[in-house]
UniProtKB/Swiss-Prot annotation:
The lineage of its organism: Bacteria, Pseudomonadati, Pseudomonadota, Betaproteobacteria, Neisseriales. The gene is murB. This is UDP-N-acetylenolpyruvoylglucosamine reductase. GO terms for molecular function: FAD binding; flavin adenine dinucleotide binding; UDP-N-acetylmuramate dehydrogenase activity. Pathway: Cell wall biogenesis; peptidoglycan biosynthesis. Cell wall formation. Residues 18-189 form the FAD-binding PCMH-type domain. It comes from Neisseria meningitidis serogroup B (strain ATCC BAA-335 / MC58).
Amino acid sequence: MQPIRYRTDLTPYNTFGLRAQARAFIALEHADELRDIVRLLEFDRDTVLWLGGGSNILLMQDYAGLVVHMENKGIREIARSDGMVLIEAQAGEIWHDFVLHTVALGLSGLENLSLIPGTVGASPVQNIGAYGVEAKDVIHSVRCFDLDTETFVELANADCRFAYRESLFKQEGKGRYVIVSVVFALKTHFVPTLGYGDLAAAVAELSAGRVPTAKDVSDAVCAIRNSKLPNPNVLGNVGSFFKNPVVSAEKAATLLQRHPDMPRYPQPDGSVKLAAGWLIDQCRLKGFQIGGAAVHDRQALVLVNKNNASANDVRQLAQHIKFTVFARFQVELHAEPNWLPASFSL
């Protein structure tokens, strides 16, 4: 087990690049080390931060508790039958690298989720999704360390209570389960999901008349994301800052009367998902800046660290966007990233 480090700079460990320090910090390289970590004097179950890629957090101040950085790596095939492959990835694996690995193996299911920042361990927590695919569609099970019993358990997909950007791990399981690995059920036969027009067009261009492959879809997704989204290594950000709001069919119909070109996505339960980026863009907020935090000038759904933004800059900007969108559309936006501490959340 790695030694504990004190007063550790967390700026490199959060993709928005907010300045903060951890009172205590330790890197976890193997899942079995959890049994020792929970016995450290610095460990407090109520305050410990289990940190992956730092692409879904906003550090609003120095972190007073222990930060455990999940660095456990490894990918292995578990089973293969009837055109399906179960493949396990450790929580510390970089998500995009894992996606590319599965595509290179000739497996299908994750290609639409290419270039999403973060680690494998975070994928079930947020139920990450893009271009018509969510993590829940391909997750078979999640292996966790149960802090209640201090044992390893495996939760089936149904046990994880997945919903749009939600899961057991954000609700009643938060603070109990530490995700150590995820098992994915992937196909050996490629079945494309091309419900988004821009993706379908990009794949058609790449495949140039031949039957498209999972790699074509992955390459197209990467090209689209690179054209729209800033690289967090160059311009700090946490990807999509707001969830796409879901409203009733009646509310959507009312909005359509005033905004007939409004993008909308009917859901199986009769509700309608709206495009948060479009709502923000209609409020002419692209490029709007408070202190060092700004709305990206090409993608309204992304807030960026333009000039050494403070935590307060980010909070004020997010609050301004929420208020402005609500004033115009009477639709409430909710932030995707976790505010730390949670008392700062809007």
